[in-house]
């Protein structure tokens, strides 16, 4: 029984390591694609990064790079998004720095990039127009329209540029 458990832990660790390596490789491409999508929404100076972290654990069952790590059914990586909204700003966790309007536009960028693999069918954007107007609003409106071809998009907006491209009101 002990040998079987050791074998299962070894197999899990091997698969989790492969998964972590794949995530690390894909996260670079994903970061680039999301940055490009953000630039299309007039967030020209923004930097976006997908970071992988592992939480340490007292449990010695699974080790990664010589450290005991917390593990689960999806491996041992924690994924966190980092953002610098403007050139020269330090990159920080998205959850701690973005304003409401920025979060909506970043989410629009993420959802636009991941739309084919995303199981979520309905997206709600609340005041995605906060802090923008003119050309930026036109770009956001077009991105929402493009996304609405794949998903149901519900958008709360005050700008006519965005409202005018909706199929239904």
Predicted regions mapped to residue ranges:
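C-terminal lobe/lid and adjacent interdomain/linker elements of RecA-like ASCE P-loop ATPase modules
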Residues: 79, 135-169
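Conserved D-loop-proximal element of ABC-family nucleotide-binding domains
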Residues: 92, 117-118, 130-138
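Catalytic acidic motif of RecA-like/P-loop NTPases
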Residues: 104, 129-130
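Generic enzyme active-site microenvironment
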Residues: 124-127, 156
């Amino acid at each position: 029984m002990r040998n079987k458990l050791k074998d299962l832990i070894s197999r899990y660790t091997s698969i989790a390591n492969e998964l972590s390596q794949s995530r690390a490789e894909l996260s670079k491409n994903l970061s680039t694609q999301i940055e490009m999508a953000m630039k299309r929404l007039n967030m020209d100076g923004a930097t976006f990064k997908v970071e992988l972290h592992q939480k340490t654990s007292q449990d010695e069952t699974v080790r990664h790079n010589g450290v005991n790590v917390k593990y689960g059914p999806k491996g041992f990586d924690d994924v966190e998004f980092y953002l610098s909204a403007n050139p020269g700003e330090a990159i920080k966790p998205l959850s701690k720095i973005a304003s409401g309007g920025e979060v909506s536009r970043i989410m629009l960028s993420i959802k636009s990039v991941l739309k084919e693999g995303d199981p979520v069918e309905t997206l709600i954007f609340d005041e995605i127009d906060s802090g923008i107007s003119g050309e930026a609003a036109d770009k956001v409106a077009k991105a929402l329209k493009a996304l609405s071809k794949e998903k149901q998009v519900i958008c709360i907006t005050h700008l006519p540029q965005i409202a005018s491209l909706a199929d239904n009101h």
